[in-house]
Amino acid sequence: MISLLISLLIFEIVIEIDFSYVCIVETNSMNTNITEKKYKKLSIQVALNGLSFCCFDTLNNTITSFNEVHFDTFHKATKTEDLFADAFSDYPELKESYDEILIIHNNNLSTFVPEPLFDENFLGSYLQYNTKVFETDFFAFDEIANCQMNTVYIPYVNINNFFIDQFGTFEYKHANTILVSKLLIASKNNPEKKMVVHINSGHFEIIVVQNQKLLLFNSFDYTTPEDFLYYILFTAEQLGLNPEEFPLELIGKIDTESEYYQLAYKYIRNVSLVDVSDLQAKNTFSEAENRTHFILFNS
């Protein structure tokens, strides 16, 4: 509880920073001669319990294929890299040639720091308030230039090393960089404070935005619907948001029949799922798949 309060207090600083910019995350493409360009991009979202990936047609801005691999059960002695190697054997499209390759690290080891308060020499200090850090940890950051802030996080170094062996060069970033950037863009010209909750397996993120300002970001572990509801209501109370009034939008692995949705709906008046119709127009996958894989499909 103490760490939660500290994290919430830290983000009161963020409230004072004006993020009134069109927040577009700039990416650097791999060097490709125009005559060799294939107009193909591969994005792989990685976690310790599996991976998902999709292929993009960059000429038409569409998603051409998508697959998901779960590491349901495996022996403790099994290396994560071996499980990824098996996935590469099972899915030949992972070995095809691409103009761009993006690796997306999905974990709850991240935070956001406004540019005026950011110093890349002290990355670990930003994370120590909401996660346990060690001297041996490797820290990285994603610059979100047009939002004047940075995502600070701990990537999966062993997984990055595996991809170096597979691809040689690639770009990587944190999943929450993509998530928050998209939510800030969507909040443009909306003066209302909105809470968005992104549900992952075992953890979820709470993001509060208002007209391209990031008012709060925090990540929580959970095991029950009651855990889920408690953190939402506690965060709302800290920010002075009235459960009878503020809009709560849910995204990720959730639908209206979920017990998590039903419990939130019981205590918060304005609950809905994030609208993914614009994203769905760029692919042939279902609304539920677009909601679950919102970050990957927006990469």
Over which residues does each language-model region extend?
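Hydrophobic/aromatic-enriched cytosolic interaction surfaces used to assemble or bind macromolecules
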Residues: 4-299
